[in-house]
Amino acid sequence: MHPARIPREYWRQRFQLAKAMGLNTVSFCVFWNAHEEEEGKFDFKSSELDIDEYLQIAKEEGLWVFLRPGPYVCSEWDLGGLPWWLLRTPDIKLRCSDPRFTQPVERYFHQLAKVVRPHAVDNGGPILLVQIENEYGSYPRRDHDYLVWLRDLWVKEGIRGPFITADGAAEHYLQGVTIPGVAIGLDPGENDAQFALARKMNPGVPVMSTETYPGWLRHWGEGWWAPRDVSGLLKLYMDTRKSFNLYMFHGGTTFGFHAGANGDKHDLTSYDFAAPVNEQGRPTPAYYAYRKQLASYLPAGQSLPEVPAVIPTMEIPSIRLERWSGLWEQLPRPVFSEQPQCFEALGQNQGFVLYRTRIPAGVSGKLSATRHGDPTIYVEGVPTQDLDIPARDKETTLEILVQAMGHINFLIEMEGDRKGLLGTVKVGGTVLMDWEMFCFPLKSDWVTSLRKTSPAPGRMGGIFKGEFKLDTMADTYLDLSNYKKGVLWVNGRNLGYHWSARGPQYRLYCPGPWLKKGVNTIVVLDTELTEPQPVTGSDSAVTTARTLACSRSG
């Protein structure tokens, strides 16, 4: 359970759910890029970033903690938890001994250690296990000195372990990434032969399953979450006294712009993961089945705690929105450059950048550009999918609006996943010069301060705003089935990306604590619509008929 994916007000209830199912330890990832969004500025206190409080509640609820601090964690999180600003260095090598990477890591670990050190087990705290990196055997660089350096850095900061690595359960994943004296985690460990192999690769250390999957990740355009029965694996672990970690026991939501990607497949905003506890914190049938199974291993006369009360949900009648503005009516001051610059060079993580230039008179040919992100092309203000540009007797305005939807979170391709236009843009053989770039990072203060404007004719990228009144607050799922693609904010809180045009997620989870009695404000940005559509609140997530079987990849 990752605190950044769960409303802070619900942390205790989620811990109680874990204990009531029969678990004695909770693992969680620390997302570096959430705590150091801007280089050198750390935040370990705001809302869902207060891991000191999270650890304290775990202790109060009688649970141990398996800490997974990275620096890389994957977890279908933007850039695997690494800060986007690392990519401002053009040739940086991530996850290795490159000093341009290790120096920021050292600074981050120093700040993180101040928070977690008092909670270490040898200081009377709940942190029972600390992970070194994550699935490094799947990374082609395999800098063993880097792994040892991470372990030694923790020791230097007063964190003495115990330590563990986590890798796939095959020899090629484990080769060259084990550390003497450091336990081995398998992602996942599913049979005795895999555990025996791990012991052979690093004799004398404990082995556990660090990621046993009751579900699997999902991308936009794929099927809805599909549960996987792991009762057979639980029997194996319990009968043979093997430690295990359910990934995920409770997934929650990847709020804001934190969802990652695998290649050109973007991760969903929902991180339900078909876990025993669903996105909203409600126990599923699998939860009760696993609870019964684990309870059967208790000594005579002992029982599990009662399952805590569920968090209530509510429906909200149709909310009327109006067209408030649009990206084109909110253009900021441009940045000028001979050639287009990527998002990171412009000091931006995600959101949009509008690139504008002029095609000289008489120039024709196919428009070609290297880009990372989803582009919409405008010629003289008219959207087009035709890349064949005809010659004109006067210069032509070309605009390319690029949306970034999460950096790659797995494998070495993440090193080159800078967003926006990369390098030169050509029409035929002519390189286009002298670019204006308008940056839209879409931060909450920008959304809450939007001025109402008249619409720009024919321009997509509408910003729609509405209000709704509540007498009581509860969790809800805001239904965006009538919209296409964009971002949703409620009371200034970014609930994440919506992409109903692709599915399978059509409703975004809105926690009750983020609502208020009286007037609430909703803002929807949609890249494809020019007219507002109503939004409703549902008491459950939507699913589709399309489901996919769970399988491990990578």
In which residue ranges do the predicted regions lie?
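The substrate-binding groove and active-site-proximal loops of carbohydrate-active enzymes
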Residues: 1-8, 32-49, 87-107, 131-142, ...
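Aromatic-lined substrate-binding rim segments of carbohydrate-active enzymes
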Residues: 10-78, 151-156
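Aromatic- and acidic-residue-enriched segments that line the glycan-binding/catalytic groove
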Residues: 40-46, 60, 71-95, 147, ...
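An active-site-proximal structural segment forming one wall of the substrate-binding cleft
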Residues: 47-67, 90-127
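Catalytic-core region of carbohydrate-active enzymes that cleave or remodel glycosidic bonds
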Residues: 63, 156-157, 187-278, 282-285, ...
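Active-site neighborhood of glycoside hydrolase catalytic domains
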Residues: 100-179
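A cross-kingdom feature marking solvent-exposed beta-strand/loop segments within repeated
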Residues: 274, 278-286, 341-345, 373-395, ...
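Aromatic-lined ligand-binding clefts that engage carbohydrates, nucleic acids, or primary amines
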Residues: 364-378, 398, 468-491, 498-499, ...
